[in-house]
Amino acid sequence: MYWIGYDIGSSSIKAALIYEDDGRVLAVEQFPKKEMPIVSEQIGWAEQDPELWWQHVCTLTKTLIEDNRISKNDIKGIGISYQMHGLVVVGKDLKPLRPSIIWCDSRAVTIGENLFHSAGTEKCVEHVLNSPGNFTLSKLIWIKENEPEIYNRIYKFMLPGDFIALKLSGECVTTPSGLSEGIMWDFKNDSLANWLLEDAGIDPSLVSDIKPSFSEQGFVNKQGASESGLPEGIPIMYRAGDQPNNALSLNVMEPGEIAATGGTSGVVYAISGQKNTNEHTRINSFAHTNHKADQTRIGKLLCINGTGIQYSWIKNELTSELSYNQMNQAAESVPVGSDGLQILPFGNGAERMLENCNKGSRIHNLNFNVHKSAHIFRAALEGIAFSFVYGMEILKNDGVDITSIKAGNDNLFRAEVFAKTIATLTQSKINIVETTGAVGAARAAAYAAGKFANMGEATATDKIQLTHEPDATVEPYQEAYNAWKKTLQEYLKN
């Protein structure tokens, strides 16, 4: 018997099959092989066709079943992970009324700022833990203000994962975690933030039915089965946005645990047992997958735009003949602190953790008689690592007591200089685990159905690929970090 998981990204869709008995991975597939198109009719806009996501889900499902020579009737349930903060609106026929406004669309920034003040900044922080920002609710208000003929035809609005569940089941359902990422969940009252919707002029009846992240959220109907190739009647047991789901995939579920990502941009996702926040201008707080009224589990999300993109820029523009492994090895030949060379890696747009500062990247203390290319490689890796540590200090100030750090098997966390710098400065070992969001979603669905006692059991077959231990000698790392942070503070003042 198997469980299937989907990860609905903006670049591609992934699907995975896991064995029901122990959570082992049977297969993982991705489609399309080239990135899905994102339509940008104006600067700052980003839209995708939700039906295209569904078409790729159907293609992947049939491919998984055929290539692995299994019976579709052996698939027992479904889990869904999806790109966060997107907006899909459907009419009474349950078809999209317009393209989805996805996560990287920035058209609603001003709307969110205005709502934050009209609804009351203190009330927003106390109840929804965030400013409405540029998230799902603000995007819906944009439609109301700019496309009233479409808004007036809306039957339900939803997140990308909710739409895929709708296509499978014919039911409009969402989750508290999903509503929290759209800044519509009242943590203080453990309910939909009706007061915020009313202030925004949004009819609460447009919200889909609300069910827990781990629960029966619908069953594959006849049409969903016919189009996808799945058996009719199997349950959708789980859904969550990609960052909470990434943490779940790494079995990051309890206060103090951190899931880190070091891709083009960097993410630190920390679990907290507290509902309050002191840092709402620099981090976002959402309901984690296992959050309940009587069990506070808040995912505190800190993003760093200028991470892997900086390292890839150095590779492509300065040393294209070297591989990343060769760059990493060269960096290891340079002492901690890069002989004084410092790089601030903030060259990929406004950085929320720096309160939306957008001054660009900086190289400091470059000495033509001392510094070689290897120094640049190390200073780049250290600068990114220092940014992560700086972000973790913000999380600590927001009540997170770090107990463990886990990361997926991506390029930056395979770089010894990068990972050991973080491990040493936080005094936390970093475990690198090979997994994917689609696998995590499949396991979470099986867990929700009672096939596993907890997510630790569901992920027990995952092997730790690599462990980065703190260096026994902390002083040079701390000195280098303190010097870098002083440079950062001067950079922010000027």
PLM-predicted stretches and their roles:
Residues 1-98, 110, 153, 208, ...:
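N-terminal glycine/serine-rich phosphate-binding loop of ATP-dependent small-molecule kinases
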Residues 24, 31-32, 103, 179, ...:
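A generic structural motif
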Residues 44, 66-103, 129-134, 165-186, ...:
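Short beta-strand-loop/turn "lid" adjacent to the catalytic site in phosphate-handling enzymes
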Residues 3-5, 17, 109, 116-130, ...:
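Active-site core segments that coordinate phosphate-bearing ligands/cofactors
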Residues 206, 212, 243:
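Extracytoplasmic ligand-binding clamshell segments of periplasmic binding protein
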Residues 23, 49, 78, 105, ...:
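Residue-level signal for inorganic ion chemistry
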Residues 45, 53-54, 103, 142, ...:
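Signature tryptophan residues that serve as conserved aromatic anchors
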Residues 33, 82, 104, 214, ...:
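Residues that line or immediately flank small-molecule/substrate-binding pockets and catalytic motifs
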